[in-house]
Amino acid sequence: MQLEATPRGTGSRASRRLRQAGFVPGIIYGPGVEPLAVSVRSTQLERLVERQGRGHLIHVQVEGEANPRQVVIKQLQRDILTQQVTHVDFLQVDMNRTITLTVPIVVVGEEQARRRGLLITHELDEVEVECRPTEIPEAVTLDVSGLTEPGPVTAASLSAPPGVRVLEDPDTVVVSCTVIGGGEEEEASTGPAA
């Protein structure tokens, strides 16, 4: 997807005026790249994030430049009440070097675990990965369909496509698995003494 960007002035007043006019202030930076303050249309950015999420290669055409810049969204800041994007950081990438970015975790097999009486609680929704810009995954997956016992499932069990390295500590808990109704059964068996 392509975004159109316009170079902008800096400062909180200028940023506030941009937001009121329907734009999001942002910055493009990266290794060997002079940081450039830009603005993008709020509707265009929101649509892109809604359709593709944050972990995708984006072509940003900066007004006055001949070629689009290859970037990824490094950080989105949102208004705490409205959830509208208030600022965006774009990391300009070198197509021949690896980058670090955050991608979502997709848990598969929850229905099978539920049929076995297990409840899956999500502890971590996204994870940092390292890969080339052309290998950015939609997500990394965690398959819980084979779980038969309660307990934690860690980042060591995440599955990433070839060329993608998960940077999360392997011992970090991604989901917790508990027995459905386990607490109630225990209370019933230790009921009041006669």
From Swiss-Prot:
Which keywords appear in this protein's UniProt record, sorted alphabetically? Ribonucleoprotein, Ribosomal protein, RNA-binding, rRNA-binding
* Gene Ontology biological process terms, A to Z: translation
Q: Care to name a GO molecular-function term for this sequence?
A: 5S rRNA binding
Keyword RNA-binding among UniProt keywords: yes
Q: Which InterPro entries match?
A: Rbsml_bL25/Gln-tRNA_synth_N, Ribosomal_bL25/Gln-tRNA_synth, Ribosomal_bL25_b-dom, Ribosomal_bL25_C, Ribosomal_bL25_long, Ribosomal_L25_dom, Ribosomal_uL5_bac-type
* Source superkingdom: Bacteria
Q: Which GO terms describe its cellular component?
A: cytosolic large ribosomal subunit
Q: Which CDD domains match?
A: Ribosomal_L25_TL5_CTC
- rRNA-binding is among the record's keywords: yes
**A Pfam family hit:** Ribosomal_L25p
Q: Which SUPFAM superfamilies match?
A: Ribosomal protein L25-like
Disulphide bonds annotated for this chain are: none
- Explain the purpose of this protein: This is one of the proteins that binds to the 5S RNA in the ribosome where it forms part of the central protuberance.
Instruction: Give the protein family.
Output: Belongs to the bacterial ribosomal protein bL25 family. CTC subfamily.
Q: What's the subunit arrangement here?
A: Part of the 50S ribosomal subunit; part of the 5S rRNA/L5/L18/L25 subcomplex. Contacts the 5S rRNA. Binds to the 5S rRNA independently of L5 and L18.
Please identify the protein, giving its name as recorded. Large ribosomal subunit protein bL25B
Organism of origin: Symbiobacterium thermophilum (strain DSM 24528 / JCM 14929 / IAM 14863 / T)
Protein's gene: rplY2
